[in-house]
């Protein structure tokens, strides 16, 4: 199985499949198709259980994708409060700026997320 199947599992919250990929040797910090890491895809889609699993397996919490976007920024852009909460609790850098020049706090209009980032 390749990137497409792994990315599908990451985006759709199939934790069992993600665990199988990782147990089979998939690097949790590998750059996938699209120039993004597994953590970015999970964060984009609000898959907090997968985010938590990947972090436990050593995923780089501050990894930037090909556009300079971190997983925390991805979660902020998409309004995924639980993922933002996980990233903040695990020490994600809240000051990294995305390609638009905005940090995590500045990049969201969601008040619940802003409260987590203060």
UniProtKB/Swiss-Prot annotation:
ANK repeats: 1-30, 34-65, 67-98
Keyword annotations from UniProtKB, A to Z: ANK repeat, Cytoplasm, Nucleus, Repeat
Cited PROSITE patterns: ANK_REP_REGION, ANK_REPEAT
Keyword Repeat found: yes
Domain of life: Eukaryota
Database matches in SUPFAM superfamilies: Ankyrin repeat
Pfam families in UniProt: Ank_2
PANTHER family linked: ANKYRIN REPEAT DOMAIN-CONTAINING PROTEIN 39-RELATED, BRCA1-ASSOCIATED RING DOMAIN PROTEIN 1
Family the UniProt entry places it in: Belongs to the myotrophin family.
Function: Regulates NF-kappa-B transcription factor activity. Promotes growth of cardiomyocytes, but not cardiomyocyte proliferation. Promotes cardiac muscle hypertrophy. Plays a role in the regulation of the growth of actin filaments. Inhibits the activity of the F-actin-capping protein complex.
Name by which UniProt lists this protein: Myotrophin
